[in-house]
Amino acid sequence: EDQSNFKENLKIINNQIKQIENLVNEFSDFARMPKPILKNNDLIKILDENIKLLSEVDKSITIDLIKTNNQIIFNCDKEQIARVFFNLIKNSIESIQQKVEKNVSFKKKISIEILSNDHHIKLILVDNGIGFNQNNNIKEILSPYFTTKKQGTGLGLSIVNKIINDHNGELEFYPENDGAKIEINFKLNGNWNFNSWW
């Protein structure tokens, strides 16, 4: 019994060490986030690469990409935008996995839609995971150290938001009846004009 207690305590300590490592790494990332190096990149290609990579994490989750164009060129820092897509899709996967832990039987899916016109690029990500608490507002969700995950540091979304802001964009969260919806709007030129969507 003493040995099993020792093993359990060791496991807890190891998990705590990992959490501290994650926190230190993410905090240094947040503090040292370089200015974006802007080049013309294809957002569809960056999205496709991240979807392929993250589809391997949990093959029981369907990830659909809905696109109106085969190519959307955006003047951006490829590494930073890839990190945004990676973090948001990974969050959706983890949210669905948390729902599965509650023994809920459902069709696990993530839908990503990307639209563009002369003024904006809009990305809409919808998942049917545990979702956001209706009581949490956008400032809470994006504040450093806010997290709903057992092992989370709460810095991931702050980093994502900073990258999006640095690319002249905005991040919005919408609680859904069954999951969550996230929207990213990148402004391409001039002032925000949401009426310009078709």
Residue ranges of model-derived segments:
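Conserved DHp (HisKA) dimerization/phosphotransfer helix of two-component histidine kinases, i.e.
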Residues: 5-33, 38-41, 45-57
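Conserved micro-motifs of the catalytic ATP-binding
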Residues: 33-36, 73-76, 148
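Conserved catalytic submotifs in the C-terminal HATPase_c
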Residues: 62-72
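ATP-lid-like helix-loop hinge signature
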Residues: 93-118
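Short conserved segment of the HATPase_c
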Residues: 132-144
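Short alpha-helical Gxxx[C/S/T] motif in the catalytic ATP-binding
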Residues: 156, 160
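Detector for a conserved hydrophobic position within an alpha-helical segment of the HATPase_c
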Residues: 164-165
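Conserved glycine-rich
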Residues: 169-170
